[in-house]
């Protein structure tokens, strides 16, 4: 066996850990590219009305897609722990059963989402001017919801199967497909929001369907392969419970985004929604680094927890906290320096909107100092198969604290209260995360 191949059972130095998590980090960044690229081309080639419509309906679509993220992250923790006990046959069965369950969830989501799309768009504040674009974009994405969910599912399991580089290759290919098709369909052919939606779903097919062929091939060196699954409601329930924090994070993000949009429509109008859309795109990419790191670490943590290797758990925890602190400072500094060019890139055609976006981004950037610790803390407890604590952190961070901040801070700080809302939520969540990590350190032996 090559000395360069990194296995879950290894001892991880800082360099080895960074090498292992590099692929999932880049995977998450490229996944975030979908909405960012759509937003860039729609804003610059279809105008701010279409751009505002996309940002208004996206939280609704994201709420359905997060089911794949839930089963992927929660299921990968369960499968990695099973591998840690040495039961390869059961790991394959669980992996296959969870994949089939995600496909069924995707089909059901498409049906439900189709009927709820128009009332949801109206509830989210879509005006008669925005509604047609909301419906057109939403219907195209809903038809391919299963591929979207499977893409999230496979991101976690490529890491667990010790094939993060292959997962990265699929994600990069899907991301490049989206970029090229957006350029052709929106930039060259002026296909507007229909072209952007078409580019997105084709790229999701690449990332969500392509990996199936790999895992059906039992001759490759993956730790996991598809087999004829035996359904287990208990295992599916455990995977969903493990991934409930990720479900809560994504559902809450969708609900909170909708609340942001409603507040901004009331305080500023469509320009506020457009500015918030830019913040979300920048936030997607920056948070993708932390989410990718947490996803990359999770199977390692689950494996060593299953193997009762407490020394390695302590090693992983210490190194992670240090690297997250360094990354947070670097991202904050980058966001401050890049606020003007980023605002210009998305909305440079409107001077007033560009200035609003630049100001908002500089305030919003303070959240990058803190969010990495909270994302990791939630994922850490998921990896330890403690879905309850993980979900509690996510629920407070992404819903309770943010809803409070979005509703209350504008009363004190006016529009700046909207831009500071996430900073407040991350600071409050950090206190909760630190307390829970301290309380459970002897139970799980990571510190």
Regions found by a protein language model. Name each.
Residues 1-21, 79-144, 188-244, 301-367, ...:
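Short alpha-helical transmembrane segments in multi-pass integral membrane proteins
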Residues 24, 28, 40, 77, ...:
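Transmembrane alpha-helix boundary and packing residues in multipass membrane permease domains
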Residues 33-52, 121-128, 184-191, 251-285, ...:
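Helix-terminus/linker motif at the lipid-water interface of multi-pass membrane proteins
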Residues 63-66, 110, 178-183, 208-212, ...:
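Hydrophobic transmembrane alpha-helices of multi-pass small-molecule transporters
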Residues 19-38, 140, 174, 203-207, ...:
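Transmembrane helical elements of multi-pass membrane transporters/channels
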Residues 9-46, 59-74, 78, 103-110, ...:
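N-terminal transmembrane alpha-helices
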């Amino acid at each position: 066996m090559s000395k360069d191949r990194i296995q879950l059972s290894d001892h991880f130095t800082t360099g080895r850990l960074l090498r292992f998590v590099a692929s999932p980090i880049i995977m998450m960044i490229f996944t975030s590219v979908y909405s960012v690229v759509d937003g860039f081309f729609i804003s610059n080639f279809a105008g701010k009305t279409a751009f505002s419509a996309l940002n208004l309906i996206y939280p609704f679509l994201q709420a359905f897609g997060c089911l794949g993220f839930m089963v992927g992250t929660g299921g990968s923790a369960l499968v990695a722990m099973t591998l840690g006990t040495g039961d390869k046959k059961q790991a394959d069965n669980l992996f296959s059963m969870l994949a089939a369950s995600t496909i069924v969830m995707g089909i059901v989501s498409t049906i439900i989402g189709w009927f709820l799309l128009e009332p949801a768009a109206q509830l989210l504040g879509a005006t008669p001017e925005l509604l047609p674009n909301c419906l057109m974009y939403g219907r195209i994405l809903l038809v391919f919801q299963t591929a979207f969910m499977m893409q999230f599912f496979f991101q976690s399991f490529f890491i667990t199967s010790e094939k993060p580089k292959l997962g990265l290759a699929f994600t990069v290919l899907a991301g490049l497909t989206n970029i090229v098709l957006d350029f052709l369909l929106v930039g060259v052919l002026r296909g507007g929001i229909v072209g952007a939606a078409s580019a997105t779903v084709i790229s999701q097919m690449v990332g969500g369907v392509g990996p199936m062929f790999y895992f059906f091939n039992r001759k490759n060196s993956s730790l996991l392969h598809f087999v004829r699954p035996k359904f287990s409601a208990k295992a599916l329930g455990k995977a969903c419970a493990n991934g409930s924090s990720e479900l809560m994070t994504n559902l809450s993000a969708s609900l909170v985004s909708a609340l942001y949009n409603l507040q901004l429509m009331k305080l500023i109008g469509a320009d506020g929604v457009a500015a918030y859309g830019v913040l979300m795109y920048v936030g997607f990419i920056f948070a993708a680094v932390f989410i990718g790191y947490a996803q990359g670490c999770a199977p390692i943590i689950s494996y060593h927890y299953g193997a009762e290797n407490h020394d390695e758990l302590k090693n992983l925890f210490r190194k992670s906290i240090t690297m997250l602190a360094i990354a947070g400072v670097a991202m904050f500094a980058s966001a401050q320096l890049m606020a003007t060019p980023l605002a210009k890139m998305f909305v440079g055609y409107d001077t007033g909107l560009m200035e609003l976006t630049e100001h908002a981004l500089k305030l919003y950037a303070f959240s990058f100092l803190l969010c990495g610790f909270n994302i990791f803390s939630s994922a850490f407890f998921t990896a330890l198969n403690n879905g309850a604590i993980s979900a509690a952190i996510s629920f407070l961070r992404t819903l309770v604290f943010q809803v409070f901040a979005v509703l209350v801070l504008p009363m004190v700080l006016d529009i700046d209260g909207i831009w500071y809302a996430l900073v407040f939520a991350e600071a409050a969540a950090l206190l909760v995360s630190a307390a829970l990590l301290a309380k459970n350190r002897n139970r799980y032996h990571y510190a």
